[in-house]
């Protein structure tokens, strides 16, 4: 009986020593004040803020950050030289928010962005170069069909721009030049019939615009010069319709801010 008590006391002592040694190895800095080894930082309420490893003040290996509700905020896996990191970032509810790669703390290559309200719903996929969008950008509906595609050059919208209905039919087709809508601007009903067609010149309506009925017949013809219609007698409803369409064109929400895409 006494032997059991002595043995238990010995094991407890060993465990306490190990814990003390482990704690003493945390949050170390070298003579130059640089973080080295295993670091755990906590919020004022003692909840862990981050848990990771440093070498010469730079993060290496797995590095985890947490929200104050203890949910994982991000997991970054750093290269040995700390220049590259594979990132998985999470919403505060635990759903995945985005995935991609950093090089020198800048987004690089393909990045994916996910919904805050539907777990795993991929909203957007974009290509980055030195933290700027370059190449094709795709937005998706919850069933993974494409909602929109357009291209970027150094974070500026350039080239063809297409939006789709959930059934795959084209909703809108136009193009950008230096981040402004430029050239033909066509919109279709979900049944595939033309809804309106017109022309933009540097984000301003220009030339002949036609509005169609759902059966494809022409409802109105309007002539624009520098964004001003010559047809001042047209019904106010149709004028407001075009104004609203212009206001909302391309307003699929920023995938980094919301999990909803406008149909």
Residue spans for each PLM region:
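Glycine/tyrosine- and acidic-biased, solvent-exposed loop/turn segments at the edges of beta-strands
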Residues: 19-263
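Bacterial Sec-dependent N-terminal signal peptides
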Residues: 1-26
